Every structure is written in structure tokens, then in C-alpha cells.
């Protein structure tokens, strides 16, 4: 498939200011690379291309990349190596990395730093540690490459619901990727507008936010995950109590290894825990997608 090179794409242009300093100015990026086509990576590509943007995709399993490209051949191109991003993406290149955090991400980012050129963009959308982002940003900057970290929440349900995006990096670069963020995020329709808000719809209301400089996106995602795990732990503890609220109905052996139940008459409830969670999902203050 041939990329539509004549369409408007996002790229950086060098502009010489009156003080003699050369800076980069940006237009909106409409072509993006994606490395890692697991359930989230592939669904991100589907949302991006359903919005009319273009994607160049790579996965270590070449058949996965070819299969995804076959779903939308006018907007998705499969390549067989990371080095091909240098020629497959037009204008300013932006490549989104969606692989497991740690050594795999480290290896991919290093290869991209040797593949891309000044003013290109590396996007880490995995669950990397924010302090690693700081180092990746510094390393990329030595080659003039921009680094953007994106805490991506939405899981396998994001294809239909959209993805919440917590973003760190230079403001101008993040803004240049607005079309991509808007394609991926849930959109303003995902939730009622918060009381007190008025005027133009903000990016946060669309489901994405520039949280700050390098590392800010993954820092916010780290806290998000901590809250998520805390919620799941609270649910688990509470539901376990409900499940075992019938202990007073069970025979208990009196021995050194069995704690006595002081008032068995207080614990004689046979709760339908699944049904309780169903009602909690409907109007309860503890209602949550996690339920």
C-alpha cells in the first residue's frame, strides 16, 4: 500500500527567529507508527485509523502486523523491521511503543533512537517507570529526538470505550499529536460535564491530558494504578467478608488450631455475593468499572 504523502501530515519545520536562534514549529501529525500489536497496541491502531488517520505498524510476529494491515489497507501499512520507519513514515515521524515495560521497552527505544532523525518523536505508551522516562528523554534529546511518555488506561475494552491518556513531554510536541490523542481518547460523551465547567471543551474532558514535562504521564499513571489496586483490594476484602458471613452456620471443631467464634448467631447470613455486586453497579457510591 502506498502512503498518502500528499495529504497534510504533521512535521517540524525549522524557523530562524529574529535573534538568530533556530527553533522548530509544528503542524498536526496524521501518520503514526506503532510497535507492539498486542490487544492494546492493535486496538489503538484501530481507533487511530477509524478516525481517518494513518498508521505504519510493526510487530515481532510479522503475520500479526500483516493481518492488522489487511483490516484497513487504505490506512494501515505493515513493515518488517523497525528500521523501515525511517522511510515508511512521511514528514516528522512519530512512533508509539506499546510493548512490555522493562528491558523490551529499553531495547526498542534504543533502536528507535538510532533509526529516527532530529525532530522525530518517540512515544512510550506502556507502563514504564517515570524515572526511566527522564533518562530516555535525555538520551533522545542528544539526537534531537523528542520523547513523550503516555500512561494509557483502558485495557482490552479501550477499542469501544476509548483510552484515558496521561501524557508527559514538551507541550508543543504533545499539542502536535492532538489528532492522535483525540482519536484514541473516549471523547467528551464518555461522562457528563463536571459541575462548574463552562466554555470550550478541554482535552481533559475528551479523555487526554498533558500532565507536565517528561515523566509526568507515567508518574500520574503510577498513582492511577496504585488507586486501582487499592480499590481492588478493598473490594476483595469486603466481598470476602460477605462470602464468609455464614461462618456461624458451620460446625467448628474446638482445638488449639481453631479460633473460637464468640457469637456464631451473629454470622448466619447466606449472601449472594454476585447479586450484591450487581446492585452495587447500579446507583451505588461504590459503583465502578472494576465491579
State what each model feature region is.
Residues 2-4, 11:
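Low-complexity, intrinsically disordered or signal/transmembrane-proximal segments
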Residues 78-79, 124, 146-150, 190-192, ...:
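General beta-strand structural signal in soluble alpha/beta enzymes
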Residues 121, 125-174:
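Rossmann-fold NAD(P)-binding glycine/threonine-rich loop
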Residues 11-93, 119, 156-159:
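NAD(P)+-binding Rossmann beta1-loop-alpha1 motif at the extreme N-terminus of oxidoreductases
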Residues 162, 166-168, 176, 183, ...:
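Helical "substrate-binding/catalytic lid" subdomain
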Amino acid at each position: 500500500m502506498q502512503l498518502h504523502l500528499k495529504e497534510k501530515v504533521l512535521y517540524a519545520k525549522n524557523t530562524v527567529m529574529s535573534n538568530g536562534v533556530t527553533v522548530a514549529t509544528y503542524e498536526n501529525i496524521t501518520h503514526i507508527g506503532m510497535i507492539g500489536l498486542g490487544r492494546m497496541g492493535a486496538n489503538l491502531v484501530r481507533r487511530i485509523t477509524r478516525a481517518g488517520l494513518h498508521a505504519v505498524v510493526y510487530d515481532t510476529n510479522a503475520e500479526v502486523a500483516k493481518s492488522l494491515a489487511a483490516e484497513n489497507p487504505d490506512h494501515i501499512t505493515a513493515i518488517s523491521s523497525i528500521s523501515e520507519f525511517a522511510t515508511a513514515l512521511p514528514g516528522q515521524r512519530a512512533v508509539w511503543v506499546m510493548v512490555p515495560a522493562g528491558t523490551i521497552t529499553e531495547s526498542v527505544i534504543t533502536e528507535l533512537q538510532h533509526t529516527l532523525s532530529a525532530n522525530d518523536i518517540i512515544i512510550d505508551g506502556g507502563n514504564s517507570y517515570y524515572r526511566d522516562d527522564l533518562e530516555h528523554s535525555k538520551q533522545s534529546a542528544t539526537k534531537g529526538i523528542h520523547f513523550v511518555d503516555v500512561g494509557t488506561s483502558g485495557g482490552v475494552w479501550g477499542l469501544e470505550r476509548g483510552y484515558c491518556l496521561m501524557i508527559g513531554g514538551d507541550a508543543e510536541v504533545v499539542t502536535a499529536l492532538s489528532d492522535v490523542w483525540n482519536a484514541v481518547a473516549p471523547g467528551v460523551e464518555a461522562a457528563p460535564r463536571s459541575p462548574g465547567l463552562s466554555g470550550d471543551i478541554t482535552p481533559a474532558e475528551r479523555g487526554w491530558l498533558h500532565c507536565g514535562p517528561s515523566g509526568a504521564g507515567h508518574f500520574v499513571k503510577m498513582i492511577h494504578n496504585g488507586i486501582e489496586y487499592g480499590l481492588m483490594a478493598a473490594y476483595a476484602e469486603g466481598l470476602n467478608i460477605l462470602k464468609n458471613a455464614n461462618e456461624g452456620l458451620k460446625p467448628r471443631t474446638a482445638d488449639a488450631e481453631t479460633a473460637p467464634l464468640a457469637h456464631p448467631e451473629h454470622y448466619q447470613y447466606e449472601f449472594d455475593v454476585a447479586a450484591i455486586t450487581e446492585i452495587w453497579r447500579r446507583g451505588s457510591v461504590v459503583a465502578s468499572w472494576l465491579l
